[in-house]
Amino acid sequence: YISVTGVQTCALPIFSEKRGDTVHIDVIDRHGNMVSVTPSGGWLQSSPTVPGLGFCLNSRAQMFWLAPDLPTSLAPGKRPRTTLTPSLALHEGRPTLSFGTPGGDQQDQWQLSFFLRHVHHGLDLQAAIDRPLFHTAHFPGSFHPRTREPGSLMLEETFGVATIDELRRRGHRLTVTEPWSIGRLTAAKRDPDGLLRAGATPRLMQAYAIGR
C-alpha cells in the first residue's frame, strides 16, 4: 500500500522530468577508427506536420529565419546555422581526438574551453572536462523565440571570487551557478602508440567513459 499523500516529487527538475533530448557519443575502436556523433532533432515532438505535404521539419530546420535577405533565411538548397558540433581533431594528419557535448547554443562554447585546456594547457582529458565552465547568451538564440541577453555570462562559482569580481568590474552581467552544473562534455583519444583514453563529465551523473 502506498499513500498518495506521502509521495514526493523529485526536487531536481532535470531528474524528475523524463523526456527525449540531445545526446553525444565518442567512439574509437582498436584499429583507430573514430566517430563523434550528436544525435538530436526531436522533430516528432517539436515540429508539426507541414500542411499539405505530410512531413515534419527536423528541429534544426527551425533555425532558419523567415525574414528575407539574411544568411540563414529560409530558401531552397540552403542549410541553417546549426548548434550540433560533433568534433574530431587531427594531429599530423592522423585522427587523434573525438569530443563533443549536448547543449544547444552552448556546445561550441563548452567544447572550445575543453579543447584549449587540453591542447594548449596540457590538461588530460578528464582534467580538461572537470575544470569550471562558462557560456554566454549574448548572441541571439538559435531556437524560437531567439531571445538574447546582451552582456550576460553564466559561470560556475568554482572560478573563484577574484575572477567573478573582476568579470563584474568589467561590466559582465553574471549568473553564478553551483559547482558541477554547466557542461555535458565527453572525449576519447588515441595516443600515437595506440593507447586509448577517455573522459566524461561527472556533472548531473549522465555521462560515462567505458573501455574494453
What are these regions (language model features)?
Residues Y1-C10:
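Single conserved hydrophobic/aromatic residue that forms the stacking wall/gate
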Residues F15-P179:
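Proteins synthesized as precursors that undergo proteolytic processing into mature forms
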Residues T5, G93, G183:
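Structured loop/turn residues at beta-strand edges in well-structured enzyme cores
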Residues V161-R212:
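In a subset of proteins, long, contiguous C-terminal domains/tails are tracked
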